[in-house]
């Protein structure tokens, strides 16, 4: 069964596209905007420090000047693939840094990405080293890029469904939770329905492994101490001989250190009565004598206590052997053995729980499936309810973008089995021309039409970030449609910073800030520069974009565009 949202009637063809005054420059975005971009050694850019205004910012320049490099740089800050071919030829590394804030660099948040020709890279947030994934998560909340060909993402049924589900997040999340619970129960039931013999074999194996490890109860840190003790027990005879020899020399021998020191103490008696220095030295010798006697006593204890202990040696060797056996089977380290034992115990507990729960699990699956159908029907109802106003809003913009006869609908078709995203497929059907049947967007829309639909989506649903980048959004359009695209971009810039790479004068003329990308040859090498255009320079650039020259007629046309 296919259910379709109502398609509004086509609007009449407008005689002219009205152009309203753009919002004031630096219109406040919904959050911190991209205020500064620094690029070093990226493609044809050697060094760039670019201050970015708020509102609508346009980047223009001749083909090949390097406009796309700006977008490539921002893509790196979004955690894009590390393409080391972007590093300028002859340089060891590239660096891109973006600052988000009100223009005060000292108080701005920053993100940077460094790539080296050696294949290494680094990402930082406000100076702190982070992973590329952390950089990506941070930047995705601040910057969105609509790449030159990203409009093709609208061809994906999942993305088409996502447009609608952004308006039914509560119902979509409830369905996702219900589906996850149902699938988990189904998976457990399927495990139970597997071969009883195989499950019993697995339980026996896991039980043996858990018992074998638990009986030894290995401690990952015990091997070092055991090896030290093994070395001591294996050399008790040598230890006893060494200690006895020390005792002989210190106190027990015919000529020993204690005796000689004692004689020295006595020899100093006469002089110590009359000289304080001699007395001090005599006292030090007495202390040395006490120390030697104490050491001799301890060595005597060592010698007497170092008798062979074969039982202790056997215990240590047996413990090391047991640990070695476990490492050979479950290692290679004791840490691995302990981890294996924990995982085996967890898996064993799960299998044993499955055995106990076999009687009630089918009932759980049935109940969860019934709940899933209920929640799925609520999701379909919400999608149908929201589809019509969303289509109305999208078509209102699309028709202003030079497609006055455009029609559109979200078609829901029931699935044979519940999917992770719902009980129905969602397909965006579209027609740009009168008399043509609605068809899948992927089959009937041209590249230019896709770009305008994407722009309508961005305007109606809004970008999720305070800064939005459009790379060649104007591909395949001109004339009144170009003016309409400029108007929509200007509207989007009311609440967000909008950065647009464009080749159309109609769009560049509506920008609050106009940047030109130029390519020059310096010292025999191509270098790209970016500068902010104002006054006559901007007028001449608009004229060049219109006519390829700065004739008086082109300049007059440019003045008209800039005047609005």
UniProtKB/Swiss-Prot annotation:
Which InterPro entries does the record associate with it? DNA_recomb/repair_RecN (IPR004604), P-loop_NTPase (IPR027417), RecF/RecN/SMC_N (IPR003395)
Give the matching CDD domains: ABC_RecN
Q: Name one GO biological process term.
A: DNA recombination
What keywords tag this UniProt record? Answer: ATP-binding, DNA damage, DNA repair, Nucleotide-binding
> Pfam families given for it?
SMC_N
- PANTHER family, alphabetically? DNA REPAIR PROTEIN RECN
Annotated function = May be involved in recombinational repair of damaged DNA.
Q: State the similarity comment.
A: Belongs to the RecN family.
Protein name per Swiss-Prot or TrEMBL: DNA repair protein RecN
